[in-house]
Design a protein with these regions (language model features):
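Conserved S-adenosyl-L-methionine
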Residues: 79-190, 195-196
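Non-catalytic, mostly N-terminal accessory regions of nucleic-acid modification and defense proteins
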Residues: 1-98, 165-174
Length: 197
């Protein structure tokens, strides 16, 4: 399955969901020896959570956030994740507004992005606001596992087509990244990518 997903042939105008699947599995290794166990895990989650219900999806998101806290300490290839209290504080200080773009060029599992989304979610009142909310974030993550976790995090925060990319932002000119038509980002909320390889 991993090899098949990593080698998907994509049309030039492929939907972002297809691009995300290919990118997520390109560098992935399958350490699970038993496919039946994976199926059981998927079935258990599917039976327990109705992802069409906001409250259940939100509760699952909180569980997911708790699991991600385990990654906040060093030890995974020298990676450091910013504590949630810090990401929340920084987002509150920058106070992004609905309609502004928020970028994190070393987004890890999406801590800064979700802190910004939590502030933006309070401003959503109409379907038009929801559309602005869903297009407000932009992220780049070099490593495959944090990238996958970030995509999952965005989906749990009602971002159906996350503008999060599997890439190394240090290998490109920051001006090459475009979000809005004018190529500008309103808010850059991030820590530099120190540590890791």
């Amino acid at each position: 399955l991993f090899k098949t997903l990593a080698s998907l042939e994509l049309a030039q105008n492929a939907p972002l969901r297809q691009v995300v699947v290919k990118a997520a599995f390109t560098d992935a290794n399958n350490y699970m020896k038993d496919g039946i166990l994976l199926r059981q895990v998927v079935n258990a989650i599917d039976d327990a959570v109705d992802f069409t219900e906001y409250k259940e999806r939100h509760a699952f998101g909180e569980i997911y956030e708790t699991i991600l806290k385990d990654l906040q300490s060093a030890g995974n290839a020298g990676e450091f994740y910013t504590p949630r209290a810090v990401t929340d504080f920084m987002a509150e200080m920058l106070n992004p507004k609905l309609g502004e773009s928020v970028a994190d060029f070393a987004c890890g599992t999406g801590g800064f992005l979700t802190s910004a989304l939590n502030l933006l979610a309070r401003q959503v009142k109409t379907p038009a606001d929801q559309e602005l909310y869903s297009k407000s974030i932009y992220g780049i993550e070099k490593k495959q596992l944090p990238y996958l976790l970030c995509i999952t995090n965005m989906l749990l925060h009602d971002i159906d087509n996350p503008q999060v990319f599997h890439d190394n932002s240090l290998e490109h000119d920051v001006r090459d990244y475009r979000h809005k038509e004018d190529g500008q980002f309103d808010v850059v909320l991030m820590n530099p990518p120190y540590g890791g390889s």
